[in-house]
Amino acid sequence: MTYCHQFLSNLSSLTRFRLHTGNVNGYTQLKVRRFETSAEELSACLDLQLSSNPIAADFKENSCLLLCDNDHMDNYERDEIKITMKVFLSAWDVQQIDQAVTSLKEQLKTKDIEVLILSFPELDLIDGESEDDEHRRWFEKVKPLYTYMEKLVETSEIASIGVSDFSARQLKEVLEHFDVKPSINHVRLDGCCQVPPELQALANDHDVQLLVHNDPTPFPTNNIFKTFCEIDSGCQKAVCSPLFETTWLSRYSVWVRKRSIMTSKGYIVQFIRKHD
């Protein structure tokens, strides 16, 4: 039995699995390139990994497939590093947050994470809905997810909360409603070079960092992972695209505190079996 057929056999018994790139900072080819978006970086990473290494047939603990050596923080004590993660949700589902946080803690062998930034799903539009009604509907979706992140802070699993692409109105709503305030708002400056003044003033008044990102919205996870799901490798068929689809994706980085050096960066994505 070839490794590819063994891989397919292992997949057949799973309802879900996770793919972990490992530390992508180990690839010089990626470090010297400039990517317009993080999606381009992830796609290039997968192309490089899957063209240079055969697909592993065996899954690690908790059905996680590691694509390269997970060299991240073994040379540092835990208090010497800072771990940040950003989770891209495909649905308004608390379980996706729980799974992403649990998976990263398992992969990095840590009990806690310093910063969790959440990228919320796009809200479905309703024809004829007023802006105020849309905002109220959005906030009802946000409440249970943000409440869950507050619980993660209370249990010391994460130290601080971040949000992504919140307008001034959205950020104000969260600041007024929740006890644990966001410390970061990830913003993408499409077509302009400065943050809207109202958002900047609100962030200054509440000590919220406005950090610029290059993540597309929504993150095109399924399109990127066609690279993985359509690997041929002697099987003469797509490996997993007929069986699985992606749900959440997380990106993490590990920083050395006193030196401001990123020692590791990687991606984890979850696949679930498609319903017939």
Residue ranges and their predicted role:
Residues 76-82, 110-115, 158, 182:
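A general structural motif
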Residues 68-78, 104-110, 175:
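Acidic (Asp/Glu)-rich catalytic clusters
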Residues 92-109, 171:
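Short, acidic/polar
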Residues 1-81, 89-92, 251, 257-258, ...:
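Alpha/beta catalytic barrel-like cores
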Residues 3-16, 120-276:
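Beta/alpha (TIM)-barrel catalytic core signal, keyed to glycine-rich beta->alpha loops juxtaposed to Asp/Glu
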Residues 84-95, 135:
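Active-site mouth loops of central-metabolism enzymes
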